[in-house]
Amino acid sequence: MKTLTVSLLSALCLAAPAWAGQGTPADSVRHLQGVEVTARLRQEQGINPLGVPAKKLPLTISSLADSTLSLRAITQVKDALRFVPAVQMKSSFGAFREISVRGFYNTVYMVDGVRDERSTLNSYPLGDLYNVDQIEVLKGPASVLYGYAATGGVVNVTRRVPTEKFILGAHVRGGSLGYFDLGANVGGKITDGLHFYAGGFLSGGKQWRSTNDKNRSLFASLSYTKGIHNLILRLEGRNDFYGTDAGLAPVMEDDMYRVSDDKLYLKKGELLPGLKREWRYNDASDFMYNRAYNGSLKYTLSLPSGWK
């Protein structure tokens, strides 16, 4: 080990003068003018109103992103909320939806951070999710941040915002009982600072109990950014049809016996003779349309971080 050490030191001593004797290479450093790199972070209004990372707040928030909805082919709110813990949804008369969060049916429903005041009654039709970026659910006492009628929680749906990335998509899907849905969307950059997005969706089919429900929607969004100013215009229209359903007649709450001979007539949970679960229990002339048209214009002024 001692010999090896001496050899290495000798080699270094011999190499140093040889390197020093060589000519100094020409300076290849070029001085450039100052280069400024900037980026813009645009954050849409979510269910967290404080602007602080959720992991640092005592809030219980569950979210489903667009990638999750697309992967599971989810286009309806009732299907999306099945993947959120402590949230349930039930339907009445085929068209009306009731959302329960942690057992409470007082739930606020919002679109792009704006309350849908129909949620005061918590029984109303809901549109499709084809043009949605994400769904967020705020559970527990923190729901008081959104005012009255929010005992259970808050559901916020964020619709798509145009970006400069070009997108072009379409899909066609079919299922049992005659179900089908199809959609198409396109978006991208028009010019510097000006972006657009547009999408349409249609679903229908005979479906369970022959209700022939249909969802039809069109959505368009335009975004313009110049410096610290940003404008987002959203326009949406939908025309949904529901073949309302009163539901099954009550089943037997207990075993039923004949009075004449005291023999078992119907068991607990059975339907009355002649009724079928797949029938639609309503009049053919009883139906419902959900027509809705809305628009919004949002202006955002982004102040520099050093502004006081």
What do the predicted segments below correspond to?
Residues 32, 106-110, 162-167:
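Short, charged/polar, Gly/Pro-enriched secondary-structure boundary elements
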Residues 1-72, 82-84:
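N-terminal Sec signal peptide and the immediately downstream disordered periplasmic leader
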Residues 89, 98, 114-139, 158-160:
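Short acidic/polar hinge/loop motifs at secondary-structure boundaries
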Residues 129-171:
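A beta-strand signature from Gram-negative outer-membrane beta-barrel systems
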Residues 40, 44-54, 58-61, 78-115, ...:
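Extracytoplasmic beta-strand/coil segments of soluble accessory domains associated
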Residues 167-169, 174-204, 209-267, 272-275, ...:
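Transmembrane beta-barrel wall of Gram-negative outer-membrane proteins
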Residues 72, 76, 96, 119, ...:
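Transmembrane beta-barrel architecture of outer-membrane proteins
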Residues 40-42, 66-67, 86, 104-106, ...:
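Solvent-exposed coil/turn segments that connect beta secondary-structure elements
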